[in-house]
Amino acid sequence: MQLSDFSFELPDELIARYPLETRSASRLLHLDAKGQYHDHMFTDIIDLFEEGDLLVLNDTKVMKARLKGKRATGGAIEILVERMLNHTTAYCHIKASNSPKAGAELFVGADNIPVIVRGRHENLFVVEFSQPILPVLEQYGQLPIPPYFNREAEEIDTERYQTVFHNPEKIASVAAPTASLHFDEELLAELDQKGVKKTFVTLHVGAGTFMPVRTDDITNHVMHSEWCDVPQETIDLILATKARGNKVIAVGTTATRALESAAQAHGGKIAAWTGDTQIFIYPGYEFCIVDRLITNFHLPESTLLMLVSALSNRENILAAYEHAVKDRYRFFSYGDAMLIDKLEV
């Protein structure tokens, strides 16, 4: 399967660079189990879900992971914290005119907090901070909004690039689980009133989510690693949902990858799991848990577009995307949403 099989034309003006005034005011394109698409508003999910269905949400929180700084010589640098190893050490991306060597001292924030490059880990730098990382990020960091916004993070992003249900103790992502950004408290309350249940998994989203696929044959692509947790409480609800004939609805590709990683770790069995995942889902993958998926519109030739193509099929997804472009849907993180049903075969 070739990378070019997942290409489509997207006018630049359809990239949503700011959120709508109201979270749940987005549009929704429903791709049903027969491969037919239907236009809705996002709030129509109330009518598209059944009592007893189960929403699975990712409760991670986005860090203010981007730090501006300088070398001892004064040259500008930028650090993006990818993963904290402990309170003062992290794997980081570093942008600089020349790649810093082990032992290099850098300074971040307005107060020039010292950090030291201790070495490399694959394509990342191991960086030791002179102070606890999270308070430094909170005081001096910026939210690492996606590169296709083509702007700096602003005050509006502080609220709107986080989900309303994030767990403040689980602050470790460098990107939001964007399908969840459409849910506000009012919509969640309406779903609860209807009898749609919800549960949580955790997947801390890494910067690799924005990395392009660089192999023509997609099966040669190696996914970045992300930490996830699928607790027993969630598994119990999933098993009960399936036992009564209801649907498991993953909210976002991150929740999907967490759930399917847990199943793959147990040979396809639905069971709890915690660990690092590099799961790569593309057409031909057999889903073990997910019946329906809420997701945003994704970049051409991205692993996320390949994932959604596995749930329906490539032709159906690209036809739906072509319709979305013609009908002026908004794309990417702050854009509109899709509800994709597993294709009936």
UniProtKB/Swiss-Prot annotation:
Query: What is one GO biological process annotated to this record?
Result: queuosine biosynthetic process
Cellular component annotations (GO), alphabetically ordered: cytoplasm
In the record, what terms sit under GO molecular function?
S-adenosylmethionine:tRNA ribosyltransferase-isomerase activity
- The answer to whether UniProt assigns keyword S-adenosyl-L-methionine to this entry is yes
Q: Which pathway does the UniProt entry assign to this protein? A: tRNA modification; tRNA-queuosine biosynthesis
Q: Which residues form the signal peptide?
A: none
The subcellular localization recorded is: Cytoplasm
* The protein's Enzyme Commission number: 2.4.99.17
Function of the molecule:
Transfers and isomerizes the ribose moiety from AdoMet to the 7-aminomethyl group of 7-deazaguanine (preQ1-tRNA) to give epoxyqueuosine (oQ-tRNA).
Task: State the similarity comment.
Answer: Belongs to the QueA family.
Which PANTHER family does the record cross-reference, listed alphabetically?
S-ADENOSYLMETHIONINE:TRNA RIBOSYLTRANSFERASE-ISOMERASE
Protein name as annotated: S-adenosylmethionine:tRNA ribosyltransferase-isomerase
